[in-house]
C-alpha cells in the first residue's frame, strides 16, 4: 500500500495511526532490504536517478507551487534559495543518486576476524541499521540524498520534509519509488510522510513502536535541539558548528592566511565554516595584523579582543557571547591566546565538538592538538571546510554527527551500518 493511499484512508485527524502504519511498512521493507544484493541496490538507485530525470517537469512544477506559497508567506531569501529547484539542480539530484550507486557496498564487510583457543572462529560483519528516520526542512534534494544513502546501506528510510518543501519532496520521492519498484525493490524502502502536521515529527521521535532505529535531523538549530531533547531513539546530529582555526607560533604566515580565508569565507553558511580565529601570542606581532586585515578587506566583520582591536579601528569588541556564536555569516571572532594550552582550553570551553584546525609546522604541537581537542574532526594545516563526506571520499553524507556513540563526523553509507558477530564452531560447548 502506498503512503498516499494510506493518507487518504487514515484521514487528517489520525496522524498517529498514519505514522504507525508507515513505521510497520518501513520495518517490513528493512527486513527485505537487509537481504538485497549490492548489485540489485545499485540497479535500483540508477533506475531511481533515471526516474528523477524523467519526472523533472513534474518535480519543477511541484517546486513552483512550493515557491509560490513560500513567497506568499514572506519566507527569507536564504530559505527560498534552499527551496528552489532548477533543471540544473534536478540533474544534480539525479547525478548524486547515481554517485551513491557507484560507492562500494557497505553491507557484508568483514570488520574483524579472529579464532579462539577453543577453535571458535569469530568474525564481525557490517549489517544495516534497519529503519532510519530523517527529518529535514527546506531542501528538497535531501529527499533523494538521504533516501539513496539509506537504501545503499540496506536500510529503509522514513523521510519527513519541511512543510515548505512537501510538494517538491513528494514529487522526488514518487520518482525514486518508481525506479526502485522497477528493479524489484520494496516500494516502502523510501517513504515520505505525506502530511504537514507537526504531530508526525513527535511520532517519529517516539520511535514508532520500535520501528525506527535512528533519527537524523537536517535543518536549523531549533529543529536539531528538539530532536536531541525529545527523541527516544539514537540521534546522529550536530547542534552547532562553532569551528576554530588556531594559528600556532610555528605557523607559516602565507599558509595561515589562505587557510583562514578559506575556512571562514569560502562558504559562510555551512557548518564547517570557521567562526573563531585563535592566534598564538608568540606570533601575534607578525601574524595577527595580516590575518585580520585579509578578513576585513574581504568584507568579513571582525569582533576581537583588545589585542585584535588594536590592529584596525574596524574591529569591534568581542563579547563573551561571541566565543559561543555560530554566525553562519561573514563575521568572525578573533582572540590572541597564550600558546597551545590556552587554545585547547578555549576550544574545550566554547567549541561544539564539530571541526577544529591548527596551522603549524611544529609536529609535536600538531600531534597534541589532534589528540587533545575532543572534536569529531580535527585538522592540521588545512581548511575546516573539508568537514564534508564528499571531501572525505565517503560520497554523499546524510549529515555530520558530533556525538560519541557509533557515527561521528561525516555520516555516509558506512556509518549507516552496524555490525553483528558471526561465530562458527565445530560442536564446542561451554564448560
Swiss-Prot record:
What this chain does, per the record?
Catalyzes the NADPH-dependent reduction of L-glutamate 5-phosphate into L-glutamate 5-semialdehyde and phosphate. The product spontaneously undergoes cyclization to form 1-pyrroline-5-carboxylate.
Localization, per the record, is:
Cytoplasm
Q: Which Gene3D superfamilies match?
A: Aldehyde Dehydrogenase, Chain A, domain 1 (3.40.605.10), Aldehyde Dehydrogenase, Chain A, domain 2 (3.40.309.10)
Q: Which PANTHER family does the protein's record reference?
A: DELTA-1-PYRROLINE-5-CARBOXYLATE SYNTHASE (PTHR11063:SF8), GLUTAMATE SEMIALDEHYDE DEHYDROGENASE (PTHR11063)
Q: In which pathway does it act?
A: Amino-acid biosynthesis; L-proline biosynthesis; L-glutamate 5-semialdehyde from L-glutamate: step 2/2
User: In its UniProt record, which GO terms are filed under biological process?
Assistant: L-proline biosynthetic process
**UniProt KW keywords:** Amino-acid biosynthesis, Cytoplasm, NADP, Oxidoreductase, Proline biosynthesis
GO cellular component term, pick one: cytoplasm
Q: Which family does the UniProt entry place this protein in? A: Belongs to the gamma-glutamyl phosphate reductase family.
Q: Which CDD domains is this protein grouped with?
A: ALDH_F18-19_ProA-GPR
Top-level enzyme category: oxidoreductase
Is-annotated flag, keyword ATP-binding?
no
Q: Which HAMAP family does the record cross-reference, listed alphabetically?
A: ProA (MF_00412)
Enzyme Commission identifier(s): 1.2.1.41
Q: Which reaction does it catalyse?
A: L-glutamate 5-semialdehyde + phosphate + NADP(+) = L-glutamyl 5-phosphate + NADPH + H(+)
Keyword Amino-acid biosynthesis belongs to the record = yes
What is the source species? Methylobacterium nodulans (strain LMG 21967 / CNCM I-2342 / ORS 2060)
InterPro entries in the record = Ald_DH/histidinol_DH (IPR016161), Ald_DH_C (IPR016163), Ald_DH_N (IPR016162), Aldehyde_DH_dom (IPR015590), G-glutamylP_reductase_CS (IPR020593), Glu-5-SA_DH (IPR012134), GPR_dom (IPR000965)
One Pfam family from the record: Aldedh
Per UniProt, what is the name of the gene that codes for the protein in this document? proA
Recorded protein name is: Gamma-glutamyl phosphate reductase
One Gene Ontology term of the molecular function aspect = glutamate-5-semialdehyde dehydrogenase activity
